[in-house]
Amino acid sequence: MGSISPLPLTPDASCCPREVILEKYQQERKKRQLNCVPDNEATELHHKYAPVQGVDQPSYTRSPIITDSKVVIIGGGLAGLVTAVKLKTQGINDFVILEKGAECGGTWHWNQYPGAACDIESLIYLPLLEETGYVPQSRYSSGAEIRAHVARIILKWNLGEHICPLTQVTSTKWDESKLRWEVQTDHSDSLTCQFLVLATGLFHEPNLPRIPGSERFKGDQFHSGRWDYAVTGGDPAGSVPMDKLATKTVGVIGTGASGVQIVPRLAQDAKKLYVFQRTPSSITARDNYTMTPLMTEPVIQKPGWQRARMVQFCEMLEAEEHEMSDKDGTVAEGFDALSLRKVLNGMRKDDVAPAQMGELYARADISLMESIRKHVSNTVDDHETAEKLKPWYPFLCKRPVFQNDYLSSFNRSTVELVDTNGQGVSCLTEKGVVANGKEHEVDLLIYATGFDYEIGTPFYQRTRIHVFGSHGQTLDDAWADQGPSTLFGIHIRDFPNLLYIGPCQAGVTFNFTHTIYEAADHISHVIGDCLKDGASFQAIQPSIEAQSDWVKQTEEGSEMRLQYAQSCPPGYFNGHGRPEKIPARWGYYPKGIKAWANAMRECRAEGMKGLERW
């Protein structure tokens, strides 16, 4: 139900010639590439504004915990909580959840900025709806609704007694003599466990840019993932205006998914708003509405409805043959990627030669992006501003963003786009931000600059946790040269009884909750089998052959993915403009989430095939 028109297979007659568009793509990429220097070191801003004990974290002291458990789960986000529920379903109650935040919720705990919302249909994104009996209020849930559902899950399964909040794990180490993991924390805890689950999440460790002069700025500044309502007024639910901004000039650096959601609310409440842009996002409208019983009852009647709906969504995006009614189809409405997937599927069915497939796909991609650029022109009144807001790159180079009010915010006289022509801001002064050689005075500066994403980023950098395996080697050292080696993206050789949840080498779709479900199912069944009465083994790890085969499968098609990434402007999808520096092993499982889930089910059905046991 988005405003983007259906995708034709060739560009409209009104489009620029294809060669002109591709040349424009290259020009825009090159100007950003020259100014993009990845930096894995923590900045002064990071130390000052992104600590866990930050503006939204109370001080907390407690006595050290010394205990042995069957399972320790690191992370109380959706992945950690769903895994805990699945463990309970297996009859396993001896587990601890270590969460660095004041509350559980992961991404949704940290990202409490105004306007925070999910752009995946709530019926498939909010986990355990069928089990809790909860029906979402909106088609796309707000952050507040998601956090309330997290609390509902914790209450229903009595997970509160398992959770240790405000606890940063500092190191974990496998003790081969005891077949136990040793876990250390910032509270001097000493925990041991048979199984260690890393559910450390994707979007929680702020990525703060190294901007000269940041320490000189005299105004308030914070990252969007550490929003300070004491400075802005208002609340995470958006129930009251940010009244403290009525007399303030605000600057936002970053126009990715977070920035796009934040800007409309700031535009309403701030006296003046500057939006500093390096690269525009591709913006698609998204219909959100209140869910009525008339809409939801036909969906939720059959047992297993939520899992089935997740599968329907992934089948549509993977363009498989699947008979669907119009009601089923609403699960993926607005997903422009669906059009491109169908183009690919059609070419496969027609046995189009690989050389021709690239050409036809590129034409379809250009057509879609022309529709998105036309949407900008139709929404933004000022022609010059509209031109600067148009994305000039292939569709999936950057995360697509679905938001109705972002583009129209620039029709307000109080909102000004500061496009940096791909260069980013130059520096900060005591009074504000210098961009394009001009100082823009601001009272408040907000960094909507994203997070340290998993792909290509050292585990310690993202989590502040050292993970030592059976030979004393850290996980980062093991993956340093060639990238990750795993089985299913979950099991890691030389790290026995370690179970990892993340996108790397796993099946991934736009709905990451589906990935969490499949991973948690596998993890809980594997642990359950190991803990059965009479089990003859206490530890597992993937065999050399099984892990090598899985890595080889992950690397398949890497050359095509690399070529695509090299055509994109810098961003976290392509290693900030250096995709050749990221080994192919960091990729997702290329055969899709259904094939990934089937491979794990086959492993379990065949007596944990591919796993060594002792």
UniProtKB/Swiss-Prot annotation:
One of its GO terms (molecular function) is monooxygenase activity. It comes from the Eukaryota. NADP(+) binds at T255, G256, A257, S258, G259, V260, Q261, R278, T279, K398, R399. The record marks R399 as: Transition state stabilizer. Its EC number is 1.14.13.-. Its cofactor is FAD. Keywords: FAD, Flavoprotein, Monooxygenase, NADP, Oxidoreductase. FAD binds at E99, T107, W108, H109, W110, D119, Y125. Pathway: Secondary metabolite biosynthesis; terpenoid biosynthesis. It is an enzyme of class 1 (oxidoreductase). Pfam families: Pyr_redox_3 (PF13738). Binds 1 FAD per subunit. Disruption phenotype: Abolishes the production of penifulvin A and leads to the accumulation of gamma-lactone-2-keto[5.5.5.5]fenestran. The keyword Flavoprotein applies. It catalyses: gamma-lactone-2-keto[5.5.5.5]fenestrane + NADPH + O2 + H(+) = penifulvin A + NADP(+) + H2O. Belongs to the FAD-binding monooxygenase family. Baeyer-Villiger monooxygenase; part of the gene cluster that mediates the biosynthesis of penifulvin A, a potent insecticidal sesquiterpene that features a [5.5.5.6]dioxafenestrane ring. Within the pathway, peniC is responsible for the final regioselective Baeyer-Villiger oxidation of gamma-lactone-2-keto[5.5.5.5]fenestran between C1 and C2 to form the delta-lactone moiety of penifulvin A. The first step of the pathway is performed by the sesquiterpene cyclase peniA that generates the angular triquinane scaffold silphinene via cyclization of the linear farnesyl pyrophosphate (FPP). This is Baeyer-Villiger monooxygenase peniC. It comes from Penicillium patulum. The lineage of its organism: Eukaryota, Fungi, Dikarya, Ascomycota, Pezizomycotina.
